[in-house]
């Protein structure tokens, strides 16, 4: 554990009981949870088979297994019980419940026959993530179901009312559940819900199984939905030793069913919850974190919680940039131009650049612009929604479309504080994907047929933390390309300018000498003839 900082060591070596580690962006969540596992085995003599660890993706589970096995080389992978919630529930039901079911991995086929099928499918998935018990009767009065419909339905792109949409969704949900039952199928949400039902309904099984589970570790705890949290509580019935690693500032899946008040819920359900914080960032330069910390300050103010800022010892002279485009086209062209400059002048590989979008439709439109430009290797670029980029990091990040009604998203009307807060946290997640170069791009247009204004989120950032670049209003759009942004401080720019000037002097001198040689050769030939 010599490589751990003091905050990480304090968390890893904590006593038994319920422990929460608030692990900020880039502060080593996976490292902390892997080291905790190893500490229990190597230092406390705990049997690894009595430790149960949960994460959210197969990739994350695999990475965690590989990290832990290196820390406890005397054990084998078979000794490690590290699962996604769904894979654990599937194994548990196969062994202790009805084992003749099949898993419906793709529900698209069922909903494809419905008008507005994609939206109806989303409602069903969100609702089933928000509950532990499915209530199919009186859905009109079910708050979780109504929330799922509200989160999904967008009146601006529909010919029906919100109420009509809820009725359609209720009909689709009942039909979907009947389809699953008739065909002996479970979807992923059912796996966890059924596991909870089985444990609650069989006290002997609950007692016997939880006797063997002495420690439970959960990664990305802030993304836990109600059924997953209920499962963790049930598994901790006999030995309530929980080690929960997460970041409340990265709660961006409330719309998908993650419990917004999960940390408060935990404190209500368990006594003497101990809290730890990790704030040393190993990803981003301090200039990027200064921008991130401004957003954290606003989040803390809204949530009325203690402010915990991130810090970094990574040195760089790069300065985050806010570019104010004067049109949507100008925004796209400027980003493309800057990507070329980063590659040519700063040596940043294209696969280490990312453009992050709030919506898929903006991603698709930008991809088309890149194709039309023809100079960038589209296959190497990382064009991602912010949700898809969570957990990733890149040398250079462009946050696209920081425009009111787009980011924050059009789907909220300002009345739901949780949604506005989640949008703000999404902005924070986008910023903290950047290792060295950060570009925040807004659009400002006011004309008879278009109106765009920069996102309110940009006002959260102190002016001295951003270098602002404004676009000129061209008579002919982009007749001349915008100049590349200065990414460094004035001192370094002066040094680069001097180097460039010296280089030009040598080039000019060489050209003069070459001309003299050519003239001499021509004169010699003339004289000889």
From Swiss-Prot:
InterPro entries: DExx_box_DNA_helicase_dom_sf, DNA_helicase_UvrD-like_C, DNA_helicase_UvrD/REP, P-loop_NTPase, UvrD-like_ATP-bd. Its EC number is 5.6.2.4. Keywords: ATP-binding, DNA-binding, Helicase, Hydrolase, Isomerase, Nucleotide-binding. Pfam families: UvrD-helicase, UvrD_C. It is an enzyme of class 5 (isomerase). CDD domains: DEXQc_UvrD, SF1_C_UvrD. It comes from the Bacteria. This is Probable DNA helicase MPN_340. It comes from Mycoplasma pneumoniae (strain ATCC 29342 / M129 / Subtype 1). The lineage of its organism: Bacteria, Bacillati, Mycoplasmatota, Mycoplasmoidales, Mycoplasmoidaceae.
């Amino acid at each position: 554990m010599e490589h751990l900082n003091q905050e990480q060591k304090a968390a890893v070596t904590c006593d038994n009981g319920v422990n929460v580690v608030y692990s900020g962006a880039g502060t080593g969540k996976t490292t902390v949870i892997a080291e905790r596992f190893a500490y229990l085995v190597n230092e406390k003599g705990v049997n690894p088979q009595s430790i149960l660890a949960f994460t959210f993706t197969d990739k994350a589970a695999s990475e965690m297994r590989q990290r832990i096995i290196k820390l406890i080389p005397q054990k084998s992978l078979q000794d490690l019980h590290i699962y996604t919630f769904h894979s654990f529930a599937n194994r548990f039901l196969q062994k202790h419940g009805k084992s003749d079911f099949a898993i419906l991995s793709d529900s698209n086929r069922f909903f494809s026959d419905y008008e507005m099928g994609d939206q109806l499918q989303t409602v069903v998935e969100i609702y089933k993530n928000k509950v532990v018990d499915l209530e199919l009767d009186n859905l009109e009065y079910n708050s979780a179901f109504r929330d799922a419909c509200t989160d999904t339905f967008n009146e601006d792109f529909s010919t029906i009312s919100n109420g009509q949409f809820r009725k359609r969704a209720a009909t689709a949900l009942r039909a979907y559940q009947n389809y699953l039952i008739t065909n002996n199928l479970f979807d992923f949400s059912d796996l966890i819900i059924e596991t909870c039902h089985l444990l609650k309904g069989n006290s002997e099984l609950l007692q016997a199984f939880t006797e063997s589970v002495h420690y439970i570790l959960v990664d990305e705890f802030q993304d836990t939905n109600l059924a997953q949290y209920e499962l963790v509580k049930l598994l901790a019935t006999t030995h309530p030793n929980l080690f929960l690693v997460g970041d409340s500032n990265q709660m961006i899946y409330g719309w998908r069913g993650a419990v917004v008040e999960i940390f408060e819920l935990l404190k209500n359900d368990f006594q003497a919850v101990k809290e730890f914080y990790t704030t040393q960032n190993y990803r981003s330069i301090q200039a990027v974190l200064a921008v991130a910390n401004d957003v954290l300050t606003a989040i803390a103010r809204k949530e009325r919680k203690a402010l915990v800022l991130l810090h970094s010892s990574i040195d760089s002279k790069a300065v985050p940039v806010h570019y104010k485009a004067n049109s949507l086209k100008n925004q796209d062209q400027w980003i493309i131009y800057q990507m070329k400059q980063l590659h040519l002048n700063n040596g940043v590989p294209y696969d280490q650049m990312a453009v992050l979008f709030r919506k898929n439709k903006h991603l698709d439109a930008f991809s088309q612009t890149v194709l039309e430009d023809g100079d960038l290797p589209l296959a190497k670029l990382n064009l991602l929604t912010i949700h898809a980029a969570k957990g990733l990091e890149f040398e250079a990040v462009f946050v696209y479309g920081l425009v009111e009604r787009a980011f924050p998203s059009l789907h909220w009307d300002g009345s739901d504080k949780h949604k506005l807060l989640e949008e703000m946290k999404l902005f924070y997640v986008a910023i903290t994907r950047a290792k060295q170069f950060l570009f925040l791009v807004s659009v400002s247009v006011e004309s008879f047929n278009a109106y765009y204004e920069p996102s309110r989120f940009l006002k959260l950032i102190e002016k001295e933390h951003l270098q602002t670049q404004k676009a000129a209003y061209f008579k002919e759009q982009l007749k001349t390309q915008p100049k590349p942004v200065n990414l460094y401080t004035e001192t370094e720019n002066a040094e680069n300018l001097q180097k460039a000037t010296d280089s030009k002097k040598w080039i000019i001198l060489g050209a003069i000498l070459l001309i003299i040689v050519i003239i001499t050769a021509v004169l010699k030939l003339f004289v000889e003839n």
